From Swiss-Prot:
One of the primary rRNA binding proteins, this protein initially binds near the 5'-end of the 23S rRNA. It is important during the early stages of 50S assembly. It makes multiple contacts with different domains of the 23S rRNA in the assembled 50S subunit and ribosome. Keywords: Ribonucleoprotein, Ribosomal protein, RNA-binding, rRNA-binding. The gene is rplD. This is Large ribosomal subunit protein uL4. Disulfide bonds: none annotated. It comes from the Bacteria. HAMAP family: Ribosomal_uL4_B (MF_01328_B). Pfam families: Ribosomal_L4. It comes from Legionella pneumophila subsp. pneumophila (strain Philadelphia 1 / ATCC 33152 / DSM 7513). Part of the 50S ribosomal subunit. GO terms for biological process: translation. InterPro entries: Ribosomal_uL4, Ribosomal_uL4-like, Ribosomal_uL4_dom_sf.
Amino acid sequence: MMEITTIDTKSKLKLNKEIFAYTYNEGLVHQAVVTFMNNARSGNSAQKTRSEVSGGGKKPWNQKGTGRARAGTIRSPLWRSGGVTFASKKRDYSQKLNKKMYKRALRSIISELCRTGNLVVVSDFQCDNHKTKDFLKKMNQMEISNALIIMSEVGENEYLGSRNLIDYDICDVTTIDPVSLLRFEKVVVTEAAIKKIEEQLQ
């Protein structure tokens, strides 16, 4: 077991070494990030080729005798309202990553945050109201300007207070992902969330 000090109450909290002192695996973390980002892609981009655009079945003018350049269809990619030469199609970008690998990747990231001092533990995190101003005041008191806050359960006040801020994000233990963990300078975790993380990544 290892220990970490909470920044608000200065109490010692024991952490599971298997979760918070895991060997960093850069290749696995990269794979988890790429998989997560690809799975978030909609893949809805779609265009039409010359054969898919409606119309253009008739030759616009005779091959010879008009003095104009020859043309076979008004839906040529060279023409306005024509098809696209290399049209993009709907595509499924999703990738599969085994649960064990995904958990190990999260362990690697969390352990690295712990080693570098960017994992901050608080006894509890609650806002008295839903105002963004008060949420920012709370973060300024902790001297944290850019952070992901992980709670066991996200309350309405905390969610609404942080929703409009680009430098902060808030989530519960079940929705943590590798991209969010790496995106912010600090990761603030409550004591209750620490216990749930240990259960989830065991």
